[in-house]
Amino acid sequence: MEQPKYKRVVLKLSGEALAGKQGFGIQPAVIQSIAKQVKEVVELGVEVAIVVGGGNIWRGKTGSEMGMDRATADYMGMLATVMNALALQDSLEQLGVETRVQTSIEMRQVAEPYIRRRAIRHLEKKRVVIFAAGTGNPYFSTDTTAALRAAEIEADVILMAKNNVDGVYSADPNVDANAVKYDELSYLDVIKQGLGVMDSTASSLCMDNNIPLIVFSIMEEGNIKRAVLGENIGTIVRGK
């Protein structure tokens, strides 16, 4: 059996990753593909926690740019992440993968409230835990949620799955043909150069807690497993 490099991981899925090429909403084929990839990793004995974004349904930033109260717009974004989390839970459980959704905002009829010790216990029992509703606070991104939860549950790595790029580039490769892909970066490089991997709050949290980050494409099947096995895919960000 292949030996994974990481024992406990946080998989960060953007809302856009769940929308696939249609760019909006939840695309069933995409979410099923992601669920299959997660199952492969669980079968290696790896403990998997997932943080989902909500940008495929609603973006708080967009709402505030339209003149909406920023906090209200962000709370709407948090609710969007819960919808994504429930859809992903359903896909995983259809494949026989035990899954729990924990939300930072209490909604006991649909999910457990986020309790750190309970989340860790689920992971130890090889259940997948999906963290939804961000940090529960406006003004914080789901990237920051991933960094925070990774620190709390003592994850070995954050796997940042992208649907439009296969790593970190010097510029947007979809726009600039001369963009250079990086194999490895430090968090200070990311912050100083404004590379847009994750926001500065999330980057600082990862740097201060020494949590490595792997940025890779979710669109190629099997990439989550490859990342967990330590294969060189995408870009690794670590250290100062």
Curated annotation (Swiss-Prot):
Record InterPro entries: AceGlu_kinase-like_sf, Asp/Glu/Uridylate_kinase, Uridylate_kinase, Uridylate_kinase_bac
Residue sites binding UMP per the record: 54, 74, 135-142
UniProt activity-regulation remark: Allosterically activated by GTP. Inhibited by UTP.
Pathway named in the protein's UniProt entry: Pyrimidine metabolism; CTP biosynthesis via de novo pathway; UDP from UMP (UMPK route): step 1/1
Keyword DNA repair: no
Location(s) in or outside the cell: Cytoplasm
Enzyme class: transferase
HAMAP family reported for this sequence: PyrH_B
Role, per record: Catalyzes the reversible phosphorylation of UMP to UDP.
PANTHER family linked to this entry: URIDYLATE KINASE, URIDYLATE KINASE PUMPKIN, CHLOROPLASTIC
Protein name, UniProt field: Uridylate kinase
Originating gene: pyrH
